Amino acid sequence: MRIVEQIKSEIRQALADAVSRAVAAGALVGPAPEVFLETPKAREHGDFATNLAMVMARQEKKAPRVIAQAIVDHLQTEGTWIESAEIAGPGFINLRLRQGWVHQVLPAIQAEGADYGKSDHGGKQRILLEYVSANPTGPMVLVQARAGAFGSSLARLLNWAGYECHTEFYVNDAGNQVKILARTVDLRAQELRGATVEIPEGYYPGEDVIDCARALLEQYPDFLEKPEEERLAFLERWAPEYFRSGHERVLRSYGVEFDRWFSERSLREAGAPARLVEWLKERGEAYEKDGAVWMRTTAYGDDKDRVLVKSDGEYTYFAADACYHKDKYDRGYATLIDILGQDHHGYLGRMKAMVECLGHPRDSLEILFTQMVRLFKDGQEFRMSKRRGNYVTLEDLLEQVSVDAARYFFLMRSLDTHMDFDLDLANLKSSDNPVFYVQYAHARICSILRQAREQGLEVPAASEVDTALLADESEVELMRKLAEFPEEIIGAADAREVHRIPRYLNELATLFHQFYSRCRVVSDDVPLSRARLLLVDCTRTVLANALGILGVSAPERM
């Protein structure tokens, strides 16, 4: 069991026992509800706090402070980690622990190493996370780069927290947009061979499609000699795959990989839309009107019913989405998480209704929205002068900053907030740069360990160290922060808040730098030096583990 959770479990039991004794003494009616603990923001308020007395106020028909006093009066701390309890504010009970508790974290970190922070909290609940899912009609742009960093990190967070999370990229390689892409590429290929062509309104502009046509002719020099119908049928498969493979290549260079690339075309060719429509009709969840087939989503809170099959017999994108989500559930996933662009916000109601219409709990589908990103350089919004058009791609960004900087900067902010990305700050080699600041803490520790090794000192086994020697305030605060890491993982995973990990890393790096400025790691005091080497090595482990969750490197030299 995680050391902090073990101690919290002991505290909960002690508080529940205190309520039972107060009930036996006639001071309270009882019984004790579930005990919740939180870590106070201000250290002077203790190590943990509980609102137990306020939760019990209604059943006890007493003021929370009176209830809190009864609990404290009957709290037995002997043989526990609880040193003292005091009542604060409207009825909080603040608890201070015996100082020795914090030293228990170092043996745990050393024993678990690269696994420190992992838990079985999620009980292996199966989660399918779909993210990025950019249309295969152009390059990867900034908002998708942000979603890529977030999604890949969230998947790792969920797995660390004990869930079984798999990832997918949904490839929209079917429908009208693919037909238009095929026609655009065909026209551009003719243009490259000297023909004068006009690109109709609604077709795909930009140099990327010209690059696609150029690659086509390099691979198939006699392509234009084929009949138009044959060319277009071929391009409806080839062109989306050209862009999809480009997405895969650039995403992999950015540290984003998927368990599966799921093709919309594969659903259509397998007859999934037709089976879905029949299945919904049999359940009374679909009906025909005006020559079209509609899903009865208003029965589940949508503002209007949604068309599945248009009057011309063409399946809608909504039908494809419904098929895809039904397929996810049919594969046994309990929770679905979709990360979409903010321009899809209007889809929320219909997607939730669709899930209920498919026979699943509304809250089993979670939709997270990615807000827009602006680049800044020299204090001004930065628009790259480039041939593609008015958008900036992930490849453009990675020409300006490192993968580590790009990922870390995207992950520092909550996904649902607009973001201004400072290119100058991301390239700064100083503590003002958040990712440099954290990575430098890791590199500095590696340097300390190398220097100690040169002096004949290795990191000792925790069992051979007197951790009680680590009594300086900076050492105690550093160990407290190390102890919080497993709980931080669980909290961030359950809240889907990846930005909590960069925040934790910044706080941990700050505490390490404060410790380093106050305490000499290697000195003439060998027992103390050994204890401090253990402390800094455990700090290195946690920094590396947290950076790894974010897909950011932990350099040994900088």
Swiss-Prot record:
GO terms for molecular function: arginine-tRNA ligase activity; ATP binding. A motif ('HIGH' region) lies at residues 134-144. Its EC number is 6.1.1.19. It is found in: Cytoplasm. It comes from the Bacteria. Disulfide bonds: none annotated. GO terms for cellular component: cytoplasm. It is an enzyme of class 6 (ligase). The keyword Cytoplasm applies. It catalyses: tRNA(Arg) + L-arginine + ATP = L-arginyl-tRNA(Arg) + AMP + diphosphate. It holds the Pfam family DALR_1. Signal peptide: none annotated. Keywords: Aminoacyl-tRNA synthetase, ATP-binding, Cytoplasm, Ligase, Nucleotide-binding, Protein biosynthesis. Monomer. Belongs to the class-I aminoacyl-tRNA synthetase family. This is Arginine--tRNA ligase.
